[in-house]
C-alpha cells in the first residue's frame, strides 16, 4: 500500500522505504518478506551504509492523514480519533491539518519514535477558550478566570503554522462595590412662618463593574454590570462602576494575553492567558510556514 500523505510530508516524517514502480520512485507503507512459504510484515528495514547499519523503514507505525473541517468548540483528541480508526498501539506517524477554527488540539503521548506533521492552514486557528470575567462584589469581588491553552503534545511534531495558535485571553477582574456620599439640603417651614434650611449627608451603596471576558474560541463570558463578552479576536471591555468608591471592572485579555485588574487594583485579580503550546520541547522542526503566529507562551 502507498502512504496516506504527500511525498513532501513523507520526506519530513522520514523512515519510509521507496521502490521504483513504472519508472517512478514511490514511498510504501508496508514491506513484506516471504518466510517459510508465508508472507509476513516487516517491522523494520535496515541497510548497511559506509560500514554501519542504518534504519530506513519503520513498519509498525499507524500511518494517518486527517483534516479538521468545520469550526468546532470541542477539543480534538488525536488519541481518541486514532482509537476510533481501530488502532490500539502506541506508534504513530502522520499528518494532521487544521482547516477550521478549532478549540484546542491534544496530540497526546506516544512512543519516542512517533511523529506528527501539524499544519494550520491560512486564516485558520487553534485557540483556547477565553476566561470568564469576574463579578463585582463588596468585600470579595471575584477573580477573572484563566484562559485555556491551545495545543498540547507529548509526541514529537513538525510545525507548519500558516494560521494562528493562540491561548485564550484571561478574564478581567470584577470591580469592588462602594459607596457615594452626597450632601442634601432641605427647606422646611419653621417658627413664625419662616423657612429654614437643613443640610445633611446621605450615603448610598454603588455597584462596581464586572470584568470583561477574555478573547478565545469561544470568548469568555462577561462578569455582568455593563461588562462585555470576549470575542474570537479580542477581549471584552470591563463594566463601569457607579460613583464614589466603587471601581470599574478589568478588561478581558486579547488572544494569548492576561486580563486586566480592576480599577486601582481594588477588586478581584485578573485571569492569566492560556499557553499557545504546552509541549514546545517536543517540536522537531519548523516546516513550510514554520512556527508562524503564536500568541501566548510556548512551554515544556
Specify the residue positions occupied by each region the protein language model found.
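N-terminal extracellular ligand-recognition/capping segment immediately after the signal peptide
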Residues: 66-76, 97-110
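Extracellular and analogous surface-interaction loops
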Residues: 83-89, 110-111, 155
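Glycine-centric low-complexity/flexibility signal
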Residues: 95-100, 121-282, 289-300
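Generic detector of isolated residues embedded in canonical secondary-structure elements
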Residues: 44, 117-119, 276
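Beta-solenoid repeat scaffold
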Residues: 110-121
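Enriched but not universal
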Residues: 1-88, 283-300
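Exposed extracellular interaction/assembly regions and N-terminal maturation sites
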Residues: 91-93
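Intrinsically disordered, low-complexity segments enriched in Ser/Pro/Gly/Ala and basic residues
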Residues: 1, 5-7, 49-51, 113, ...
